[in-house]
Amino acid sequence: MGQLSALLTYSFMILMSLMMISMVFVMITMAEESGKRIAEVLTEGSTLHNPENPVYDVKDGSVDFDQVSFKYSQAAERMALADIDLHIRSGETIGIIGGTGSSKSSLVQLISRLYDATEGRVRVGGVDVKDYDLETLRNQVAMVLQKNVLFSGTIKENLRWGSESATDEELVHACKLAQADEFVSQFPDGYDTYIEQGGTNVSGGQKQRLCIARALLKKPKILILDDSTSAVDTKTDALIRKAMREFIPETTKIIIAQRTASVEDADRIIVMEGGRINGIGTHRELMENNEIYREIYTSQNKAGDQDA
């Protein structure tokens, strides 16, 4: 009986060892494939380069799309953007609205040259974006995304990613425009409050407002808000837009939003559908002439009435 028990014990130990060895081989195979993908990322060269004689000055915040079409890959069958002909004046406030997958974000990513247009030309300040020094262009085109990042460090340190040389007064002013100063001032340590990695110790709306303030510190010619007030209540959202109209009128402001309330007071609103411009106009003009905008507005206001 003892010999049988010993045999079973040793057999079980051998079986476990064989299983662990097989798991090691599986992990080695997975690690090898992961290593290949990491190496591909590290060795991938940029397809965007500075021209031989780059332009180092962005004259103003005007933006022109001249018959622009774009797709993310040359192998792609369908254009993400098609036949975009759009002219934005410097200092103008532009709203962009449309359904999911209508390429709203793709449109604005061409302005800061995160991608190059497949066809046509994109100009900023009257100059083709391909002719600019990349760093110069991107310093003058500030983008705030819906899920922007805060880093571990104090609020001051996070804000100074927008401008390392910003004074304390400039930090406070930017936060006031972004409607962030009020809640920051309520923290025991104020602007020296420590932010956890990813901003986990502040709410989504507070994080978005701090990211907007950080972008404002760059003093850009063009400010792009890509659904970056989605976690902010409508009253605060309106106060942010009001402050921008009053204090940075010379800055071109492009607001991508899901809520019509976020773009109603824009100088012009662009309605996107299927990678194309479906309509352009003021809120009143689109309510009269654009079915897509009217449907979005009606559905959101019906939902608001039901919630009330």
Identify the residue ranges that each predicted region occupies.
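Membrane-water interface of transmembrane alpha-helices in multipass transporters/channels
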Residues: 1-9
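An intracellular "coupling" helix at the cytosolic face of ABC transporter transmembrane type-1 domains
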Residues: 27-30, 47, 71-76
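ABC-type nucleotide-binding domain
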Residues: 56-308
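Pre-NBD coupling/linker segments of ABC/ABC-like ATPases
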Residues: 47-58
